[in-house]
Amino acid sequence: MPLVCLADFKAHAQKQLSKTSWDFIEGEADDGITYSENIAAFKRIRLRPRYLRDMSKVDTRTTIQGQEISAPICISPTAFHSIAWPDGEKSTARAAQEANICYVISSYASYSLEDIVAAAPEGFRWFQLYMKSDWDFNKQMVQRAEALGFKALVITIDTPVLGNRRRDKRNQLNLEANILLKDLRALKEEKPTQSVPVSFPKASFCWNDLSLLQSITRLPIILKGILTKEDAELAMKHNVQGIVVSNHGGRQLDEVSASIDALREVVAAVKGKIEVYMDGGVRTGTDVLKALALGARCIFLGRPILWGLACKGEDGVKEVLDILTAELHRCMTLSGCQSVAEISPDLIQFSRL
């Protein structure tokens, strides 16, 4: 039976993976309230289509940070893709390159940045970085990303400590130990004779540290994890180039706002001065359309990419991207939007249910 929607890929992926691997991918923090709300919140939004327009040509292309992508559907940073498929991030990168969309590669990828870039040398990529206490480490990672042609840095800000992920605890999966081991291996590759202290993301990283980061790179800096107007305003004050509205897929602090709900607050705060993106809960083309109508420049996919990877490797990731893009194209056509630029808040209303 063909897999025709993202829900099909989810169901099939679960059958392909061990319970521990599946729980790591799907795991949520605490009671999973935010995890569920990310999806449910989209369903409280209704569409207001316009008809009797010439819809013979519909274009899903847009730009992020000045670079064109085929659709406003990109790939979020998620760790350890080899859990889902042996080639891991290399397969993901090849699929993203073929689709002509942005792939944000995680600090905790299964393969080195060099190996991933070699697998898809023409791909459009950003690098996600967890800031560490060791600034030599931070600078080294930034320099590697610059040398490899990454176009932006994505700084995840919502992880001063890991969320309480009960599934991983029940499975006795020590994620923090795995992350520390990954750091140590990466540093030993660069400095094999030097003993380097390794730490989990720096809990004390704060707004004032952004200036130090900006002093060591010319790449645009995108902050991932903002959920409030106050932090959005501070982000602009500190001259970042973009924001990803995100609650880490409901894996960090439970009972925070769904990403699509927080998006409205953040977009209103930035007033179009910097680009705003979002991730969390996107499962259909209508979800993408709603996020764009509320002001997102593009959406990023996390778990669905891993579902595709678990099902069919590179081909599965490409199918997930193709399905969502086709759904968006159809939804735009049925809503009267010839281009992404025509998608506006007038397209939506909020259900009273």
UniProtKB/Swiss-Prot annotation:
Stored PROSITE patterns: FMN_HYDROXY_ACID_DH_1, FMN_HYDROXY_ACID_DH_2
Gene3D superfamilies xref list: Aldolase class I
Catalytic center residues: H248
PANTHER family: 2-HYDROXYACID OXIDASE 2, S -2-HYDROXY-ACID OXIDASE-RELATED
Activity regulation details: Is inhibited in vitro by CCPST (4-carboxy-5-(4-chlorophenyl)sulfanyl-1,2,3-thiadiazole).
Cofactor: binding comment: Binds 1 FMN per subunit.
Designated name of the protein: 2-Hydroxyacid oxidase 2
Signal sequence bounds: none
